[in-house]
Every structure is written in structure tokens, then in C-alpha cells.
């Protein structure tokens, strides 16, 4: 519920690589419904788009203990905060009236978590579920492992907490089992996993059956991640999946049309939608230095070196290996869409398949179309690099070339600081470069 696995295998840097895989994340309540379709036990729940409906759902569910969960596509909800002042996107309450009150504070407000930017994401609906009293909680997930090129089970006897913290402080509590995709999870393997997770003897059979069904769900929905945190034994000896995080492979949209119809476009960043339409891998971040790079690994290294020199990247943007002039121009338009935020741009291209002269043409076209006033530092190496340098040199634009990445990062951070200082004091700054 609180901690989430970073794909793959607890590698926290993978959050910047998500667009390369292009996955679809479904809301928790959709995941819970899919669990039910596979005859997996979940707590009684309902979904509401307003406070009155939340009250009605609580009355329908019955009982005296409820959990109200904000439905936003971001991790860290439990420790998040709302623009309405409410602390926490997961609230435990005891009456339908309290359900109504908390839902009213969530719906329509923005939830800011460690996985959102400073604006957060708007909560359009809440999930109301019956609070079950558990005696033991476990962590279970199936994801894709690049090392074995197949599914892998990652599980733990410690659930309901941040699994990355468990991996760091008590790695022996983590169970990792690669799965042969040609065989899947057999009854015997499911039982072995349940035993290693530490289920009580009375619950081993139930847990084994759920693990088998979760693999069927993973495969049947073309998922890249099925995560249950926690999977729990209740006081009556029943095993439940208390929540569900489900990521689907966008390459399978053609055969998972019903699931992809569940996509919540309102939760997607408008710039990320534009980037995807242009076949660009883009994630908006909170910094001030725009980045345009080819290759996810080089893009992450570029962001690291910007931070090393005291700057903050405004985005992750991988133009890929076959970008056109039009794509490069669109990339600049996306980077500079928030004109009051981005104060400098670093272009870092290592031309292999990607030709540096194409990048240069795109930079020049974008700088002219957008009449860019902010400094642009360009580091180009590789295929057609001399042609690219010649294009930039004859463009009569104030683009700052730099062959050394470390020096380029230092330069863009200094220039960004100058622009930020000028903006803070309401002073216009113009950069001149001797030609």
C-alpha cells in the first residue's frame, strides 16, 4: 500500500526509463476488479466521484471500519498531502459520515507525493473499502527481468511497507524467483513461493492458489508488473489481496482493447502525451535545465552530471536513434512549453545511428521558430559531427558549443543560475556570443 517496487528488481533509477517501455498504469480499483475476475479475494470496495456517493458506498459495504483511498496514478499516496490541506491519500475512518468528509477533502484536490511534481495530480475519484484486520502481511509481485528476459517473482515476508527499504535493510527477507515462461508457475512452484514468503500452514494452500492466479492474470493481461502490497492473512485465516498495482505493456494494446479503454487520460501529463505522439520519450521534472539527449542511459547520465554541478534537470527527454528534424523541433517546443520554468537547455548527442547534423538542423529550426532567448549549450559527438558544427557556426544563432560533457554541464548550470537570478529580480538578460 505504501512502498512500491521500481522496475526492474528494485532499481530506483528505473523511474526515468519508464517511457522507453511505454506502459499503461491502471487505477487501483480497476486492478481490484481484475483480481475479482480471476476469483482472487479482495476487501469489499466501491468507487465514488463525489462525497455523497462515497457515503452511499460505505453504507452499502457496511461495518464500522473503512479505508478511503485517493485514486491517482502515483506512488506514495499514504504519505502524500492534498492541496485542500488533508495529509495522506489513504485514510482510515470509522463511520460513513467520516467517509463522506474525507472523500470531500480528496475529490477535486491535487495530491502531491514523492512521485509527482510540485503541482501533484488531481484526485477525481476515491475507492472506499472495508477495513480488514490482518494478522500478517506480505509483499508479492511479478515483473519482467531484463537479466533473464522473462518474468520474475519478487516476494517478501514483510508487506505493507516500502519494499525498497526492506531490500536495503534486510535483503534476506526478499525472495526472487525467475519464471520459465514456457512452464509458468506450477502448483509446486506456487507452494514453494508461499512457504518461502512465510505463510502460516493453515494459509499455505490459499496463498499458493492466489499466486497461481496472479501469474495467470500477469500473463493474460500482458502486464509488465502485478504488485500486491500487502497480501495478507486476516484474523479468520483467509488470504486477501489488499490492493493492486497493475502496469500493462502498451505494445499489447491491440489485443487488450478492453483494458486499454480504462486508461485515465486526465491523469496523464499533457506534455508527455504530446511527446508520445511525436515518438519521444519524455518525463517532466521539477528543475530548470531542459535536457535533450539520445539514449536513455546517456539521458540519465546527463541528468546526473547536471545535479553533480548544482543544477536541477527540468525533464528527461530521449529523442531515440532515428529522430527527424521535425521531432527535434517538437522536442524543443515541449521542453520550453513552460517558459517561466526552463532557464537553459543542454543538448547532449552521441551520434551513432542518430546523425548530429539532423540534430543541429532541428536545433536551428526550433531556435528560429520559437525565438528562444534562453541559452542553449550543445555537446555533439559522433556521426556527421563536423557538418553539425558547421551548420551551428553559420546559423548566426547564439548557441554555445562544447565538446566536453563535464564542461558543458558546468556551463549550462552557470547560465541557468544567471537567468534564474535575473528573473527573480525582474531583469531581462541577453546572452551575446562572439562570432
UniProtKB/Swiss-Prot annotation:
Q: Locate the ATP-grasp domain: which residues?
A: 32-259
> Which sites bind ATP?
69, 76-78
Q: What are the required cofactors? A: Mg(2+)
* Compartments, record wording: Mitochondrion
Annotated Mg(2+) binding sites: 229, 243
Q: Where is the transit peptide?
A: 1-20
Gene Ontology annotations of biological process type = succinyl-CoA metabolic process; tricarboxylic acid cycle
Q: Which GO terms describe its molecular function?
A: ATP binding; magnesium ion binding; succinate-CoA ligase (ADP-forming) activity
- The positions annotated as site (Important for substrate specificity) read 65, 133
Into which EC class is this enzyme placed? ligase
User: Which keywords annotate this record?
Assistant: ATP-binding, Ligase, Magnesium, Metal-binding, Mitochondrion, Nucleotide-binding, Transit peptide, Tricarboxylic acid cycle
What InterPro entries does UniProt report for this protein, alphabetically?
ATP-grasp (IPR011761), ATP-grasp_succ-CoA_synth-type (IPR013650), ATP_grasp_subdomain_1 (IPR013815), Succ-CoA_synthase_bsu_CS (IPR017866), SUCC_ACL_C (IPR005811), Succ_CoA_betaA_euk (IPR034723), Succ_CoA_ligase-like_bsu (IPR005809), Succinyl-CoA_synth-like (IPR016102)
For this protein, what is the EC number?
Answer: 6.2.1.5
Provide the reaction this enzyme catalyses. succinate + ATP + CoA = succinyl-CoA + ADP + phosphate
Q: Cofactor comment in the record?
A: Binds 1 Mg(2+) ion per subunit.
**Physiological role:** ATP-specific succinyl-CoA synthetase functions in the citric acid cycle (TCA), coupling the hydrolysis of succinyl-CoA to the synthesis of ATP and thus represents the only step of substrate-level phosphorylation in the TCA. The beta subunit provides nucleotide specificity of the enzyme and binds the substrate succinate, while the binding sites for coenzyme A and phosphate are found in the alpha subunit.
Q: Which family does it belong to?
A: Belongs to the succinate/malate CoA ligase beta subunit family. ATP-specific subunit beta subfamily.
On subunit structure and binding partners, the annotation says:
Heterodimer of an alpha and a beta subunit. The beta subunit determines specificity for ATP.
User: What protein name is recorded for this chain?
Assistant: Succinate--CoA ligase [ADP-forming] subunit beta, mitochondrial
What organism is recorded for this protein? Answer: Caenorhabditis elegans
In the UniProt record, the gene name given for this protein reads suca-1
